[in-house]
Amino acid sequence: TVIRPAHTYGEGRSFFGSYMNGGLYLDRLRRGKPILVHGDGQSLWTACHGDDVARAFLGALDNPTARGRAYHVTAEEWLTWNRYHELAAEALGAPAPTLVHVPSALLARLNPARCGICLDNFQFDNIFDNSAARADLGFSYTIPFVEGVRQVVAWLEAHGGLADSDADDGEDAIIAAWQAACERLVAEAAR
């Protein structure tokens, strides 16, 4: 049996941003700092809590129907990346984030280690059909994204996992450089 979970998050497991992940990403949102978004932020993404994914794995154990089959197991809330960031901020009780859109290919060139995934994966729609997992494994998506973020933040706060985003100024540097380049381009085009 093959289980194909997509982005799985939860207590001790990470959230994604286009640049920062995990506690750094959540700290940026909480502080109301601008958030880098790859492309126009309109590609679709799913993020499923690990507890829901675990139930699919349990449903596959000793299940003769599942033998030799493959299953997608992921969220059933299809979020644009823009909405993903907005809902994460909402769950934190933070202000709506200022989203700074930068082309995926440029982000990947600026920091391949952190942003290469924007070009390789995030810029594309990541939606999957869970119907076989629901039918054969008893999978159900029970933890909405906002509730899942709240659970993870509570866990991180209890375990010292919300890192200080001021310790990494890379996202701020990219945002400042991008905004300055855009202003120069507009000024030159207006001549």
Regions found by a protein language model. Name each.
Residues 16-25, 38-61, 68-69:
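Substrate-positioning beta->alpha
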Residues 24-38, 93-100, 131:
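A short C-terminal helix-loop "cap" of Rossmann-like NAD(P)-dependent dehydrogenase/epimerase domains
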Residues 156-163:
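Short arginine-rich
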